[in-house]
Structure formats: structure tokens, C-alpha cells
Amino acid sequence: MEFLTDPVLLARIQFALTAMYHYVFVPLSIGLGLIVAIFETKYYRSQSVEDAAASRFWIKVFTATFALGVATGITMEFSFGTNWADYARFVGDIFGAPLAAEALLAFFLESVFLGVLLFGRKKVSGKFYLVSAWLVWLGSCLSALWIIIANSWMQTPAGAELSADGTQALLTNFLDAAFNATTAPRYFHTVDALLIMGAFTALAIAAWYLKKGLHTEFAMKTVRVASVFALCTTCLMVVFAHQSAVTVAEEQPTKFAMMEGAYNGEAMPLYAVGWVDEASQKVITPIAIPGGTSFLASGSFDTEYPGLNDLAKSGAYGSDFTEETISELPVNTVFQSYHLMVAMFGLIGLTTLLAFIFTFRKGRIASMRWLQNLAIVSPLFPFLAIEAGWFTAEIGRQPWVVYPATSSPEGVSLLTQASSSASVTSPELAITLALFLLIYLFLIIGWARIVIHLIKVGPRIDESGEASNETARKTGNSSNGNVEASIGKAGE
């Protein structure tokens, strides 16, 4: 239980916990946001009661998820000031602009037009309601952009210089800082993963309906949308993931070496499985393609990349990265996280292919119980891939919280050990960590019960809002009714 006496480690665990919980809801919000927009577009074109019910259903699921995403996200930002005061002072001049933009532009865009989706169905035109659905999704994508801009600066700092006393990074060029070397590849890689999560969640819900024989028309429409959606995003992921890996190899060689457990320079193999023995600095029980990773990163099986020992001996990172530092790095954790992400992508690709083929081959998925069961559990694949990818990105950056990337100005970096709040003690962190666990457990159980209830109720065509909407359209009157009625048929 040595970690209970290490305040920096406890602060890292607490932040990781809040980020992991938050990252349950962010992928669903962005992924399901597009599902909402797609089904609202279908309703706008068809004006059918079935498509109206489908749109209402996805709006409810999205709203429950969005609310928890906001709550867990606020906690993360407050922890910068409570547990990571030195870090907050160091990056404050850089992070102020993107975090303010995220709140003022993206969050307000999402919130305002989500209000339209919830309460404006009978009060605005169908076209305005449709535009609102797309703006909610656009707002969520913009929110992800500003957060990734901030995080990417930590990975490859640019457009900044150190203050005279070395305690603060000062912004010198906003565009250089915002669009640093890793912003674009990391943004497309991340958002595409979140869209895959949304597609698989929709696929799972539809597959459950097919298995139970419920709402079969809605389920088949959803399966068709989700399988095409998943196929497109999965194919794009091949491109985005490749570019992201190439960028890591160029900009963060220590992380790249940890991802493949490379201590010494070599043409890096592509491991299917393996275990890094950190004491002997070897990958044991490996199944690998020799030079496979080198080929993916450079196009040649013979390209050699430096290992951790080579990087320490080069002196490129000074006293921050030595042989002693290497002995303390969680290399196996990064190795396993990275390869879990890759393995999950393999399952994503297989599930996507099967769902697409058997959906468009006379709708055979409707009678294939084994494929329905696979689809029901399939959201676990992108979820684990997303969490494992986040672990790889953040733990692989160690021992720095602001990485001294190859393209960054000399000296703009910050060690994790120098980032935490000195006044926060280990007992305080341990107690608040336990409280966070209990509160988040309560929240996620509550969210799960709400979503499960919504799924059991399903898309209801004969809602109170339908009849009242039709009457209102004919008479020119409009009553507020309950929440269900307020998200009834658009364009009244």
C-alpha cells in the first residue's frame, strides 16, 4: 500500500478516475449526437410517425448521457486548481484561451440547441429543429477540438516560451500553440473513435430489440444506419490511426519506444501479444512480425527507431531522462494498453464487417441470434479501445506532464513530479479519492438505470404528443403538455 503515502501518485489516480468516468459519457455524447441528427434528418424528409418516434427516442438517450458528461467534466477542471496547482500555474497562460473557448463557444452551442431539441418541437419550424440537432452535434465536436488542443499542447508544446524564473509557459503565438504538431492527427483519431462508439451503441440497442422481437421496424432502420456508419468510421480509422502513430514516432520517441517495449534501437517488430519484463528490458513470450511496426510507421521493414536506452544516452532530454528514470517507467503498462487498443480495433473491424454484410443480405441479422448477441456486447470493444488509447497517450508521456517534444522550443517542459499541489496531503487525497469512487458509482448506476428504462420503453409512436400535435396543427393551437409531448412531431 505504498501508493497511499505518495501524494503525486494519489493525485494522478484521482484524476485518472475522474477522466475515465468522464470518458464513458463523452464518446456516447458525440457518437449518439450524430445518430440523433441522422434520425431527425430522416424524419424531416419522411414526416412519418415512426421516424418521429425514433428521433425522440435517441434525443432522450443522448440527453441523459450529456447531463452526466457535463457533471463529470466540471470535476476534472476543478482538480487542476486543487491537486495540480503548480501545473495550473505553468500552463495557465496557454490553457486559458482553449478552455474559455470550449465553454463559451462549444458548450453554450450544445446547451442552447439541446434546449430546442427538448422543449421546442412544437414551437419552432421543422427546418430550425433539424438545424438545431446538427448544431448540438457540431457543438460536441467543437468541444472535443478545444480539449484536444489543450491536451495536444501538453504532448507537443509550441507557440510558447518559458518565463524568466522558469515557472510558467508564456504564450507567444496562439495559432502555433493551438495547431501544434499533434493536434490534427490526434483530433481526427479521437473523434473517429468516439463516432465508432456511437455507431456500436446504436447497433447494440437495435440488436437487443431484434433479439426480443420488439420495435423490429425501428431496430432494422437503426441497424442499417449503424452498420453503414460503423463501416465508414472504421475504414477512416485505419488512416487516422496510422497517421497518429507516425506522428508519435516523430514527435514523442520515448512514448513510441514504450508502446513497443523497445529499450534498444532496432527495426521495431509488430507484436500481437507479449509481456515486457522491465527488469531484463525484454519483451517475453512474443508473437510478432519482425520490423512490422517500422513498416507501418515508415513504409520500410528495416527502419530503425531508438529505444529508451538510446534516448537516455543521447542526452536529448538532459537530466530528466536517464537510466534511473527508465527503471521507474511503467513500460509494460503502456505496452499492454497500446496492444489492447489494437486488439479491440480488430474486434471492431470484424463486428462491423459481419453486421454490414448480414444487414444488407436480405436483413438476415434479424434472425441470427449469435450475431445479435455479438452486437449487444460490441460497445465494449470501442469503449476499451478508447480507454486503452487514453492510457497509452497519457502514461506514455511520463515522466513529463508537458512533454519536451522535438518541435518545441528548448526548455518548455514540465515533470509530473513537479506539477502537484504541495499543500495537499496523502490522507486528504485518499479520502477524496474514496468519496469520488462512491459518488461516481452512484451517478453511473443512476445513469444506467435511466438509460435501461428508456430502452425498455423504446420508441413509442402512440405518445400523447402525437395526437395533440395533430390537433394543434389543424386548429393552430399549441399546448406545452409534458416533456414527451414537447419533443413530439417537429414543424408544428
Question: Predicted segments — roles?
Answer:
Residues M1-E492:
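Polytopic transmembrane helical bundles with strong interfacial aromatic enrichment
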